[in-house]
Design a protein with these regions (language model features):
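Active-site neighborhoods and metal-handling regions in enzymes and metal-associated proteins
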Residues: 3-611
């Protein structure tokens, strides 16, 4: 269905596009998995391996992968953004966390066996299923920390790890070609600081720690440092590269030269571009103490430096915290970016409300939202494939609609839309769950409990030093009181025209990083009733100094889009919660209403009316 068929032609200034930033083709081929596993097992036998590990990772250890690096999906059929597989001689375990436990069952076939992770670790499962033997792994796809942990846990079991070439690459005949996207400059008007200043600061950090150099392998950190962006990974404006930053502030950038021809003048003499296949030799030639990050450094790079006798010090990647602490320019431009995106969302939600559910599909919804966002000249990409999930599909936290799964909206169901844009001046991520017709009381009650979690985080004031894991419970307490919960974190860090998932900060049971001023995180509790419905409400928030109490922090909300008041059980709310919702909707009116079309303004006034 074309965009102009969706009833959006009357929107002021509308343009018409076919979808460009996302597709709806099915990426899962579960029916091919068993035969591919048989081919892998034959190669394993030839190599003398009893098991082989296939992670969801690439040689740069990013969360999101280029098509040629989707080895886990190619082998198993599982298309989630996190997980791994352990292949044995007669079966294979596919390890996924709570976000994907329903999805993995529909995307894999025997002899693949879904395994709940992290409740069951890879080593525990291997020990239970392999009395003794050799486990192979590609040292480019596993970090130093991963292999150290597994080695320690397998000590004394008769099971050993062996690095080897990638076995999937041997049997993946039609593997996609490498990406060749071009890097471009991220202007200082949005970045806030020059790359020379950033390099100078990190060089000082290295000298203070007596590190001669630091090895950088994460694309978002390298792009942030050098004020460049790329298109090597869909929806993530990064380049695939390695870098070494020296204590002088000079940088060796290891990348395919064709990718950076347009940014050479910007990089200047301080950055030396080198062929990516010289990276290992450059590591072996380093002198002095070298900073690495065991949690992200590929084991292959580590082994090369150890063999060369390099003195290594494990510490946090020096770009991680400065990147997470957004500067004033980044925050100011992000605020403007979020206001524009909120207006786009309101235009979309108004349109969605006016549709006949019986004539509207999940793909229609995703196309309609994308095309509204694409009227914004600052939009560069989506920040991820839109989660356009109706009815039972909304119970899959990371559902991706395809032509095979596409369903029509129905009265009496909810519609969950999780989406975002990559703009030159910021990255957005927002989820709204809306009513399609009247809702059962149980659904509205669950929605209200999720909303209470959003409010609890939003209103929080806390002392410096508090970590994300210390406050995660606040987003769950209303759900817990009803015996309900959600199997994902409450929030993740968000980049600035970078990856929509950015560390090190977050709000979850595992997040042990103190929250600091300038850090942007999502606030997105949810509830999922398998086979029936799902609810998630997500705003982005930024940590700031409390104006009232010295030494205390609080959250500033960046996202101003109405929360569906038709889904709220007002009698479940405390007075402070009702006031928060009314104040939030007033802030929506103050910030967004002037940006809306006349038609949407009428809808907007109704949706932001006081409770």
């Amino acid at each position: 269905m074309k965009f102009r068929d969706l009833g959006l032609a009357g929107l002021s200034g509308a343009q018409y596009f076919d979808p460009m930033y996302q597709t709806f083709d099915s990426k899962s081929e579960p029916e091919l998995g068993p035969a591919r596993l048989t081919d892998l097992q034959a190669v394993m036998r030839a190599e003398g391996l009893d098991a082989y590990i296939i992670p969801h990772s690439d040689q740069y250890q990013g969360e999101y992968l280029a098509p040629r690096d989707e080895r886990l999906a190619w082998l198993t059929g599982f298309t989630g953004s996190a997980g791994f597989c352990v292949a044995l001689a007669d079966r294979a375990g596919v390890f996924v966390d709570g976000r994907y436990r329903v999805q993995v069952r529909s995307e894999t076939r025997a002899p693949f066996v879904p395994v709940d992770w992290p409740e069951t670790s890879a080593t525990a499962w291997i020990k239970d299923n392999l009395p003794k033997g050799i486990v192979g792994f590609d040292p480019w796809l596993h970090t130093v920390a991963d292999i150290d942990t597994m080695t320690r846990e397998l000590t004394g079991t008769g099971i050993t790890l062996r690095p080897c070439d990638n076995l999937i690459d041997r049997i993946w005949i039609d593997r996609p070609a490498p990406v060749t996207g071009k890097a471009f400059v991220h202007p200082i008007d949005y970045a806030g600081r020059s790359h020379t200043d950033k390099c100078r600061d990190i060089a000082l950090d290295l000298r203070t720690a007596r590190d001669a150099a630091a090895v950088l392998t994460m694309g978002d950190g390298i792009c942030w440092l050098l004020n460049i962006r790329g298109s090597d990974i869909v929806h993530n404006p990064v380049i695939q590269a390695y870098a070494i930053i020296h204590d002088s502030g000079c940088v060796d950038l290891f990348v395919d030269a064709i990718k950076v021809t347009d940014v050479m003048d910007h990089l200047g003499d301080q950055v030396v571009v080198r062929p990516i296949d010289t990276f290992l030799d450059a590591l072996a030639a380093l002198t002095g103490q070298v900073r690495i990050t065991a949690a992200t450094l590929p084991r292959a790079a580590y082994d090369q430096m150890i063999a060369a006798g390099i003195t290594l010090r494990d510490a946090v990647d020096p770009t991680v915290l400065p990147k997470a602490r957004k500067n004033k320019v980044e925050l100011d431009t992000a605020r403007e970016c979020h206001l524009r995106d909120a207006a786009h969302m309101c235009e979309f939600l108004c349109w969605l409300d006016a549709q006949n559910p019986d004539e509207t599909t999940e793909i229609d919804v995703a196309i309609g939202l994308e095309n509204i966002r694409r009227r914004d000249p600052m939009l560069m990409e989506l920040s991820f494939d839109t989660i356009s999930a109706s009815g039972p599909h909304a119970a899959l936290p990371h559902y991706r609609v395809t032509t095979a799964t596409n369903r029509t909206l129905r009265h009496g169901e909810v519609m969950l839309v999780d989406s975002g844009g990559q703009y030159m001046d910021g990255t957005t991520d927002i989820t709204r769950t809306v009513a399609i017709g009247d809702q059962p009381l149980a659904v509205k009650q669950a929605f209200t409990r999720v909303l209470q979690g959003v409010i609890a985080i939003s209103r929080l004031r806390f002392p410096r030093g508090i970590e994300g894991r210390h406050i995660d419970i606040l987003a769950r307490q209303a759900l817990w009181s009803a015996g309900q919960d959600f199997a994902h974190g409450t929030g993740h860090g968000v980049g600035h025209f970078l990856c929509v998932h950015e560390g090190p900060q977050g709000i979850s049971r595992k997040s042990a990083v103190p929250l600091e001023t300038g850090m942007i995180v999502s606030n997105e509790p949810g509830f999922y009733q398998e086979g029936s419905f799902g609810i998630r409400i997500e705003n982005l928030i930024v940590v700031r100094q409390s104006p009232d109490f010295q030494g205390f922090l609080e959250f500033e909300t960046l996202t101003y889009v109405p929360i569906d008041r038709r889904m709220i059980c007002v009698d479940m709310l405390a007075e402070t919660e009702r006031i928060w919702i009314n104040d939030y909707h007033k802030a929506c009116r103050d910030n967004i209403e002037p940006r809306l079309s006349q038609e949407t303004s009428v809808w907007f006034a109704r949706m932001t009316a006081p409770l």
